[in-house]
Amino acid sequence: AQKFDGIIIEPTKSANFNPNINYYLNIESLGIPYIMINAYYEELGPTSVLLDDEKGGFLQTEHLIKLGHRNILGFFKTDDMQGTKRLKGYLKAHRFYGVPINQNNIITYSTEEKLTKPAEILENILDQSVDSLTAIVCYNDELAMSLIDVLRNKNIAIPDDISIVGFDDSFLAEISEVKLTTIKHPKIKLGEKAAEKIIDL
């Protein structure tokens, strides 16, 4: 069997207990170093390279608050550590600026629900009260693009009627007809840092 010198892993569902923990314990018993990037499984306590997702969620929300928004819907994928931390940043920004938090404005979803639940919830909210909602914080750009489609189908102008902020600064933000405000994700820098760290292990 081929022996690896090291493995860089991006965990999925990192906010949940990992049922495949034995795979990682086997890697450890073989003496193969590994690093987790973007998130980590807490029970393993591995070496990891992370983005400050809490600060990212704070910056997304702060941007909208500074533009005068007070009724900000937040969509967070909470089976990933990144989502729980971005939600924490969203809450922190509201507290910091003294903006009341409406519990109904916090929408959480799982990886399996990402293609359906957020869009359906936004449609329902818009059908009930289009006037009060003025801004949306999105877990990532992929979600932002999906929600932009919902808004356009309802003839809601962005950012005139509703402002929307993404996360990742992905190619989706670049190709979108709507100029999407998004938090930059230093993907290359993160990868370089992980490579440097694994060489040192």
Residue ranges and their predicted role:
Residues 1-8, 13-201:
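Bacterial carbohydrate/catabolite-sensing allosteric modules
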